[in-house]
Amino acid sequence: DMAHIAGLVAGGVHPSPVPHADVTTFTTHKTLRGPRGGAVVAELDVIKKVNSALFPGGQGGPLMHVIAAKAIAFKEALAPEFSEYARAVVENAKALADRLQERGLRIVSGGTDNHVMLVDVGSKGLSGRDAEDALHAVDLTCNKNLIPYDERPPMEASGVRLGSAAITTRGLGTRECAQIADWISDIIEAPTDESVASRVKGEVAECAAAFPIYEASEVGGA
């Protein structure tokens, strides 16, 4: 399964498992940036068995609009610009991880070679859930996650997971990712300090405004 890394494989910045696996599955969202869904890749004799197993017992009618959206996503992934995007995703993730480590946070695995990283916040006296809540309060999205040999239960956890795909799509670069790492570190170091939270939330809002999801003209603005 290459659900998380399909876009990086398509962009040529991560090795492909397809030549080595009998069956490969992946999502069409995440780094591939298509609609929510999935796909199965295999040799014809195997894919016939997959299709027979799925339909009609486990799959309903096809959603043609989603199939069309997947086709567009695949077409975009063939463009040279998509390879540039994939490279930027990895560069941004490395910049984020490097700066977090400079600020004293441990990255499980010592860094990242793709778009995600797992940050150990338990070493700072926080649970993953508390860190998640504190970061969400200043509009920094993440999710709690267990770390290896975690002594906390899953709903508490000792880590948070971060990724660079969405912010790269918005146009943020390595400089902004280093700044995001500073904001995260500031919050982790002082999760209950309202003055720190207020400052960080304001700076996050300014950054988000500088990299809008849509141009004003695309949503009926001036």
Model regions and ranges:
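Conserved PLP-enzyme active-site core in the AAT-like
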Residues: M2-G104
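Short acidic (Asp/Glu) and glycine-rich catalytic loops that position anionic groups and cofactors
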Residues: I47-S52, A71-A77, G110-M117, A157-S164, ...
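Flexible, glycine/charged-enriched surface loops at secondary-structure junctions
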Residues: G61-M64, E81-A88, L100, G104-G111, ...
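A glycine-rich phosphate-binding loop feature that marks nucleotide/adenosyl-phosphate handling sites
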Residues: A71, A88-K94, G110-D120, E151-P153, ...
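PLP-dependent enzyme catalytic core of the Aspartate aminotransferase-like
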Residues: E91, P154-A222
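Conserved PLP-binding catalytic core of the aspartate aminotransferase-like
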Residues: R106-G171
